[in-house]
Every structure is written in C-alpha cells, then in structure tokens.
C-alpha cells in the first residue's frame, strides 16, 4: 500500500505592496469589497453577507462598513498605504465603505465611479408593481 500524503496548507509569502485598488460593488441587496494590487491580483475581499448579515440587513450602510473593515484587516499584512477606490453600483453602502476604508488607515488617493450606464442599450424589464 502506498503512503498517503498529508495535505499541508501552503504558506503564502506576503509581499510588500504600497499602492492598491479597492473595488466596491454596491448593489441594492449586498456590498462586495475587493482590494487588489495595481495589476489586478486579488489580495483580499469581503461581503456584507459574509460578515454575518442576512436578509434585508445585508443591504444597510452599516453592513457595508463592517465588510470594508474586514477586508482592510485581511490586507494589512501587505503593507498597503495608498488606495484608489473604484465604485460600481447604486447601493446604500457606497459612502460608508469609503469612510470605513479611510478610517482603517489607508490614504485614499482617487475615487472613480465605474457604474455601467447604458447608451440606450437593452430594453429594461417591466415596471415593478408592489
């Protein structure tokens, strides 16, 4: 019989990165925060749903703030000082996420809104009736 190899988790070498990009996707239901390096390689991410909020509480500014703080803690080891923020979507977590990243010790150099806006593209779905 052959011996089984034990799966040992590989230790990742944390490299020093000074500048990063924070991608914030703020939808009406959830907020996703991803911090990458300049090339686009993901360093860490967090969501308001993954931060313990469920249902309608996921879509609150406080849930987005908690997700941003959680993501900031995950990438602290890389030594990121400056962040460029790219925001996408109309959700309620837009401003609170930026405020949380700023208070986490990052210097925000640029804020870019990359919300996709159609130039009269596809026909929108029917009007919602509640």
Swiss-Prot record:
Keyword Nucleotide-binding listed: no
GO cellular component, one term: ribonucleoprotein complex
Keyword annotations of the record: Ribonucleoprotein, Ribosomal protein, RNA-binding, rRNA-binding
A Pfam family: Ribosomal_S11
GO molecular function: rRNA binding; structural constituent of ribosome
GO biological process: translation
Family: Belongs to the universal ribosomal protein uS11 family.
NCBIfam families for the chain: PRK05309.1, uS11_bact
Subunit note: Part of the 30S ribosomal subunit. Interacts with proteins S7 and S18. Binds to IF-3.
Function text: Located on the platform of the 30S subunit, it bridges several disparate RNA helices of the 16S rRNA. Forms part of the Shine-Dalgarno cleft in the 70S ribosome.
Name of the protein: Small ribosomal subunit protein uS11
Organism encoding this protein: Buchnera aphidicola subsp. Cinara cedri (strain Cc)
